[in-house]
């Protein structure tokens, strides 16, 4: 009921915010007002409450419901696009999205945002349609060159995704071993190269469960990791990202640093 920012007027009142991973909430909303719901926008893997994977069948069920009611299914791949696979989360989870948004990796290190969708939707965008969309830096040559080079490299080196998956699995396993060894309650959520450590003894499946994490312990975790040369995102509710550039030595150093933090927190 509270606008997240000034200047939004009543726009936010026409939005429904539903709990992640709760298909019953989606079904209930559509049963009550399905003909009024223009679209559903969702992160296929939540990244701004910490990393929260979708439950099996959750995303596919949303696609089924939106198709039934003629509602647009919008997948926010700003974090997951080209990170979880060469075809992003929609490829990893086999999704049939109507519109997909991109950012981050698609720019190859440069600031880029992009969106795409099915022909019948994109034909509404100028110059073929009435919806005008342009900007002074749209299609910036430097950003486009960096993005094209990045995507081309990933397409030509598909092994990268398997290597990153192995790196993520190693770090997840080592973190869990250390937490268990020292009796520290943590939950490690990971999808591919995205991972979060939650200081809680409950499974983290949505914002409500994520918000119950012990943020005081996270502060200790962040600061003690930093002292050992490991710089993490400074929030319980952001993701840790792995890349192909991380070496075996990097991962071992990170795992050893985490082990020391668990010893402090026991």
Regions from the PLM with identified roles:
Residues 10-266:
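Conserved N-terminal phosphate-binding loop of PLP-dependent enzymes in the Aspartate aminotransferase
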Residues 1-12:
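Single conserved hydrophobic/aromatic residue that forms the stacking wall/gate
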């Amino acid at each position: 009921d509270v606008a997240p920012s000034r200047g939004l007027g009543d726009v936010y009142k026409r939005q429904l915010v539903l709990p992640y991973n709760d298909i019953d909430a989606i079904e209930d909303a559509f049963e009550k007002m399905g003909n009024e719901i223009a679209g559903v926008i969702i992160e296929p893997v939540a990244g701004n409450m910490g990393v929260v994977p979708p439950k099996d069948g959750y995303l596919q069920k949303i696609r089924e419901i939106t198709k039934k009611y003629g509602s647009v299914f919008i997948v926010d791949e700003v974090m997951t696009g080209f990170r979880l696979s060469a075809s992003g989360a929609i490829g990893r989870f086999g999704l049939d999205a109507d519109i997909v948004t991109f950012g981050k990796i698609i720019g190859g290190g440069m600031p880029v945002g992009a969106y795409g969708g099915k022909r019948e939707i994109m034909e509404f965008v100028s110059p073929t349609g009435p919806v005008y969309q342009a900007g002074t830096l749209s299609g910036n040559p430097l950003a486009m060159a960096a993005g094209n080079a990045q995507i081309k490299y990933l397409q030509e080196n598909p092994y990268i995704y398997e290597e990153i998956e192995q790196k993520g699995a190693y770090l997840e396993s080592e973190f869990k071993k250390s937490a268990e060894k020292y009796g520290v309650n943590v939950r490690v959520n990971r999808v591919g190269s995205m991972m979060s450590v939650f200081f809680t003894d409950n499974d983290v499946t949505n914002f409500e469960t994520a918000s119950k994490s012990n943020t005081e312990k996270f502060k200790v975790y962040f600061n003690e990791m930093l002292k050992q040369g490991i710089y993490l995102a400074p929030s319980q509710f952001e993701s840790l990202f792995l890349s192909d550039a991380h070496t075996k030595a990097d991962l071992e150093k990170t795992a050893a640093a985490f082990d020391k933090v668990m010893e402090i927190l026991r």
